[in-house]
Structures are given as structure tokens and as C-alpha cells.
């Protein structure tokens, strides 16, 4: 590890560190604390994966149809679990070296400069776009609560943009937490909330039963053609599996010894997390589509009309979960920016620097969310364009470079299949996502029912 450069050899405040022989890694939010264990891994990963994407899965199913929808849903779960395992295995693949950040693993595979150029922009875009979507979803949930509480007429006075501002206020406070382990309590509550609102969504749908005159065929919606909607749905599915962008950062919080490497508790936590993911995703996607067919809305909780109290509770759970999810994705961004500010620009690592960086980021994501409050369109575009590479095929490319499996062996073939499928999603899904986003921008942000 490298300490603070001599050109900025300031003495840190006593409230930041006790030892004046300061190491940068001991201050940055990803590596400041390494006392986590397998269940920290489990709930951090649940919080990271089961996010806003689960609420859009029934809508994605309606755009894909039963056959393709089920295939894509299952295939995505299997492929992403495999690439998740790859990243955990590669965290300490070289003795005495831990790849605590995604871009460090990329540098090991592609070279010091090229690795940064490939991974850092994608990871920043993934984490920033996730935070933007969570801002939008939090605002939508707050608006739904307001609508159910005061009625449609009164709710028309406020748009979803106003509720995004309210949700953002919580992130200005939570962003003050120092590192990954300091948000463990928030992440645990968020994980429980994600399971709770997912359960409410599919149980309420199942209890309601199949809607009258339900249809499962393809239909044109929101001025988006059926083929473009189909492509966009692939991006929505990809968005639902975004945990890979923080997996190494989560593993970095787990202690490691030669006798008990960090990959053991991390993989144990990942298995638990993916079982929970399956419990959340499959019932919500399948039961939601079965109940409402192609009349399901972009957010399944917006489709459910009652009982009113249950829908309010579900949206409260969504809001609490998103408070934690936002921080899980924002923490690596804070780590990158703080590292650059201290290493390259020689800023002193103080609370003022930390708060300035974090509040600026929260304000920026809030501003973009207010400008583009379109849930499904954002899922489609971001999911295909930037989530697919970091989740579906970059781990496989790195594995082929570093592990060098024998050509045409099982490992080699599996990785190339994942790469081909991931590249296809990256190319075609943003086409549908961009079309949906352009059409969404033409729609007014007016009544409660429409937004």
C-alpha cells in the first residue's frame, strides 16, 4: 500500500485517525475496515442485487412474452451467478495480492492503463445510473403513498420530480457514513425490506387472481413498437443483476488469511444472496405477469390497486430499501473520487473533502433523476448499454486472460457463450431502451396515474 505523497504530507485530524503514520487504504471507504463476514456479504449482495429492477420484471415479461421471458429470466440468473463466482475466485488469485476494486482486476488483465480505461468508465456509469434509477423509484414510491393517502385530485398538484427531491434528502444524510462496514446496519435493513416488498408484490398479485380479459400477447405501448419493446426488455432484465459492480468492493471488507481466504465466506454469502434473489425475482416476474398480462405497468406496485394499506406499506419498504441500495452503489464511487483527489491532486483527506465529494455526487444524481423521471426507459437503456458488459461478459474475458483455460475445454466454451450472449444484449438492448426513453420524454409528467 502507498501512503500519502510527500507533497501533501499534512497531519490528519485526530477524529480521522489515531496513528499519524497514515495509510491511504486505511482511510478510503472500501478498505478502511476488514472485519466483515459471510452474512455481511449476504445482505450487502441482496441489497445490491434486489433493487428497483425487480419491480419492473413483470413489465419486462409482458414485452418478452411467456417463452422468451422465462428463458431470459432463468438464463440471466444462471449466467450472473457464474460470473459472480468468477469474480470472487479472482479476488485473491495471486498470492499476497487482493484486487479490492473492479478496476484493479481489470488492470491485472488488460494492463495498468487499458484496464482503467475499460473498467472505470463502465463501473462509474453503472453505479451512477443505478443511483439515478433509485432516486426515480424512491420518488415514485413516495408519490404513490401520497396518492393513496390524499386521492388523485390532490396528488395532481405534485409531480414525481417533487418527491425525488424529498427522497434525495435522505441520501445527503446517509452519505456521511464513512465506509462499507459503517453502512452495514442500513444495508441489513434494506435487504429485509427488499424481501418484504417483493413478497407483498407477488402475494398481493396472487391473491387478486387473474384479471378479467387478461391478455398475454404482444402489443404496442407508449408509441414504442413491439420489436423495440422486446429489445428494451432485455435491458430491463440485465438491470436486475447489477451486483457484480460492487462484489470485489464487498469482498474487500472481509479479512483474509492463507488458512481462511476471503473467498470462502464471500461465496457462502453470495449463495445465500442468490437464493434470496431467486425467491424475490421469479415469483414477482411470473405471478405479476400471470395476474395482469400485458396490462401490467412499469412498476408492479403501481399496478396493484389495493388493499390500500398494504400497498402503502410495500412502498414504504421500497423507500427504506432504496436508501440502503443507493449507498451500496455510491460507496465505490466515493472511493474512486476520494482516491483520485488525494493521490493525484494531493488534497488532504479531511471530513470537508469527504462531505464535499459525497454531497456533490448526491446532488448530481438527484438533478439527473429530476430531469429524467422515467423508470422503465432508464432500466432498458442503462441495463443494456452499461450493465451487460460489467455483469455478463467482462468477468469472462478477464477469466480467459488470467486463468487461461484450455481451448475448447468446458470452461473455455462456457465463457465464450457468456461473452457472445452478453455482447448481443449490450448491442441490441440499448436500441429498444433509447426508443422508450425518447418516447417517454414526450409524455407529460402530469397526473398521479401517469407518473
From Swiss-Prot:
Topology within the bilayer: Multi-pass membrane protein
Function (record text): Amino acid transporter.
Protein name as annotated: Lysine histidine transporter-like 3
Residue numbers on the Extracellular membrane side: 62-63, 137-159, 204-227, 291-309, 380, 435-451
Tagged with keyword Transmembrane: yes
Membrane-crossing segments per the record: 41-61, 64-84, 116-136, 160-177, 183-203, 228-248, 270-290, 310-330, 359-379, 381-401, 414-434
Phylogenetic lineage: Eukaryota, Viridiplantae, Streptophyta, Embryophyta, Tracheophyta
Residue intervals annotated with topology Cytoplasmic: 1-40, 85-115, 178-182, 249-269, 331-358, 402-413
Keywords of this entry: Amino-acid transport, Cell membrane, Membrane, Transmembrane, Transmembrane helix, Transport
Compartments reported by the entry: Cell membrane
Family, as annotated: Belongs to the amino acid/polyamine transporter 2 family. Amino acid/auxin permease (AAAP) (TC 2.A.18.2) subfamily.
Stored InterPro entries: AA_transpt_TM
Alphabetical GO biological process terms: amino acid transport
GO CC, one annotated term: plasma membrane
Organism: Arabidopsis thaliana
Amino acid at each position: 500500500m502507498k501512503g500519502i505523497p510527500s507533497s501533501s504530507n499534512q497531519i490528519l485530524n485526530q477524529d480521522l485517525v489515531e496513528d499519524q503514520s497514515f495509510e491511504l487504504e486505511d482511510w478510503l471507504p472500501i478498505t478502511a475496515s476488514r472485519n466483515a463476514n459471510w452474512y455481511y456479504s449476504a445482505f450487502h449482495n441482496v441489497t445490491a442485487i434486489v433493487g428497483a429492477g425487480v419491480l419492473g420484471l413483470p413489465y419486462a415479461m409482458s414485452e418478452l412474452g411467456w417463452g422468451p421471458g422465462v428463458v431470459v429470466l432463468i438464463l440471466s440468473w444462471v449466467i450472473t451467478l457464474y460470473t459472480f463466482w468468477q469474480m470472487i475466485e479472482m479476488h485473491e488469485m495471486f498470492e499476497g495480492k487482493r484486487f479490492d476494486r473492479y478496476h484493479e482486476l481489470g488492470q491485472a488483465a488488460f494492463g495498468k492503463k487499458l484496464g482503467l480505461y475499460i473498467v472505470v468508465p463502465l463501473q462509474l456509469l453503472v453505479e451512477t445510473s443505478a443511483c439515478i434509477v433509485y432516486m426515480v423509484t424512491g420518488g415514485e414510491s413516495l408519490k404513490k403513498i401520497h396518492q393513496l393517502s390524499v386521492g388523485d385530485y390532490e396528488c395532481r398538484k405534485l409531480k414525481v420530480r417533487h418527491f425525488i427531491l424529498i427522497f434525495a434528502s435522505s441520501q445527503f444524510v446517509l452519505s456521511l457514513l464513512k465506509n462499507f462496514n459503517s453502512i452495514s446496519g442500513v444495508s441489513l435493513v434494506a435487504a429485509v425490506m427488499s424481501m418484504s416488498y417483493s413478497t407483498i408484490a407477488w402475494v398481493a398479485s396472487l391473491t387478486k387472481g387473474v384479471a378479467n380479459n387478461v391478455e398475454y400477447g404482444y402489443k404496442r405501448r407508449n408509441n414504442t413498437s413491439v420489436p423495440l419493446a422486446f429489445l428494451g426488455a432485455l435491458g430491463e432484465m440485465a438491470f436486475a443483476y447489477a451486483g457484480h459492480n460492487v462484489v470485489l468492493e464487498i469482498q474487500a471488507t472481509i479479512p483474509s488469511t492463507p488458512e481462511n481466504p476471503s473467498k470462502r465466506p464471500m461465496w457462502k454469502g453470495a449463495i445465500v444472496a442468490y437464493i434470496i434473489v431467486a425467491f424475490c425475482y421469479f415469483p414477482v416476474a411470473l405471478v405479476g405477469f400471470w395476474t395482469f398480462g400485458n396490462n401490467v405497468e412499469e412498476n408492479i406496485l403501481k399496478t396493484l390497486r389495493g388493499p390500500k394499506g398494504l400497498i402503502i406499506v410495500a412502498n414504504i419498504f421500497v423507500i427504506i430499501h432504496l436508501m440502503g441500495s443507493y449507498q451500496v452503489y455510491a460507496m465505490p464511487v466515493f472511493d474512486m473520487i476520494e482516491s483520485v483527489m488525494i493521490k493525484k491532486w494531493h488534497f488532504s483527506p479531511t471530513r470537508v473533502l469527504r462531505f464535499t465529494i459525497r454531497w456533490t455526487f448526491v446532488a448530481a444524481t438527484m438533478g439527473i433523476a429530476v430531469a429524467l423521471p422515467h423508470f422503465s426507459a432508464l432500466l432498458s437503456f442503462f441495463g443494456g448499454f452499461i450493465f451487460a458488459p460489467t455483469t455478463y461478459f467482462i468477468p469472462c474475458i478477464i477469466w480467459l486472460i488470467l486463468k487461461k483455460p484450455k481451448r475448447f475445454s468446458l470452461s473455455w466454451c462456457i465463457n465464450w457463450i457468456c461473452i457472445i450472449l452478453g455482447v448481443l444484449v449490450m448491442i441490441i438492448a440499448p436500441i429498444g431502451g433509447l426508443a422508450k426513453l425518447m418516447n417517454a420524454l414526450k409524455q407529460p409528467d402530469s397526473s398521479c396515474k401517469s407518473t
